[in-house]
Amino acid sequence: MAKTKSGGSTSNGRDSKGRRLGQKLGDGQFALAGSIIYRQRGTKIHPGENVGIGKDHTLYTLIDGYIKYAIKRNRKYASAFEERK
């Protein structure tokens, strides 16, 4: 006979891993064409010049160049330029 009652099981105690979202390249950094600039859910930052947007709203460069972030009309934009601006 068991001296003490068996402990109950729990259905808690798990957590999902973080999604590694956010800025991957900063302002003024050099990026090769196709480099990911920003991973996001929704358009927190919009694509500017020479920057494309993926189906999961990831921003990536279309040319080799320097990254520039700007705010225009209450929207944040990420752009890429061949020369540093």
Swiss-Prot record:
Biased composition (Polar residues): 1-13
This protein's name: Large ribosomal subunit protein bL27
GO term, biological process aspect, one: translation
Keyword Nucleus carried by entry: no
Entry GO CC: cytosolic large ribosomal subunit
Gene name of the record: rpmA
Region span, Disordered: 1-26
Similarity section: Belongs to the bacterial ribosomal protein bL27 family.
Pfam families per the UniProt record, alphabetical: Ribosomal_L27
Keywords: Ribonucleoprotein, Ribosomal protein
Molecular function per GO: structural constituent of ribosome
Lineage: Bacteria, Bacillati, Mycoplasmatota, Mycoplasmoidales, Metamycoplasmataceae
